[in-house]
Amino acid sequence: MRIAEFAMLLKKFEHINTWNVCDILYDVLAQHYGLETGWLDITSNFNVALFFATCTFDKGKWRPLNKSDTENDEKTKYGMIFHMPSNRMWMRWSMNIDKFSNCRDVKGENGKGENVYELLSHPKFYEKHDNLIYPIGFQPFMRCSMQDGYGIYMRRAQPLQDDIEFQKLRFRHNEELSKRIFEEMDGGKAIYPHEG
């Protein structure tokens, strides 16, 4: 319901109604703007991943992690970055594409006699899909682009910790590292643009 209301709100903006560059992914935009969805945000940019691993959103703004955040117990001392080499991503897609429903169904023809396929707002395939990574692409707002956004549609829990194709890069939290990343990302402004 909240995602539908979010989409209705976005459709009040003129540039949404005149957008003809590509499909608008309302679920993905909702996820990037703080609504809970079935999507897991991921990025192709290591510095963006580091920002989210070393900073926290606290009292309405981003700040670097400090010792009081990371030195509570063994669980909080370490951060984790999940990385999938790019050659594994397309291999995973090629091994799963036949599991999608209606992926080859023609829904009709356009005025030029070309095939028209159903436009999906999210994947129809809800069974085991091995954490497929979807490119978000260009969207009418800049946040997805500035975060080099991709997404995994998590219709059911498939923890990245259990996924053997994701490399797990564990690191020891360090207040100095957190501050440096925070400053390099201009306090988050480098990936959270001012959009009006």
Task: Show the residue positions of the predicted features.
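Catalytic-core elements of nucleic-acid end-processing and repair enzymes
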Residues: 1-196
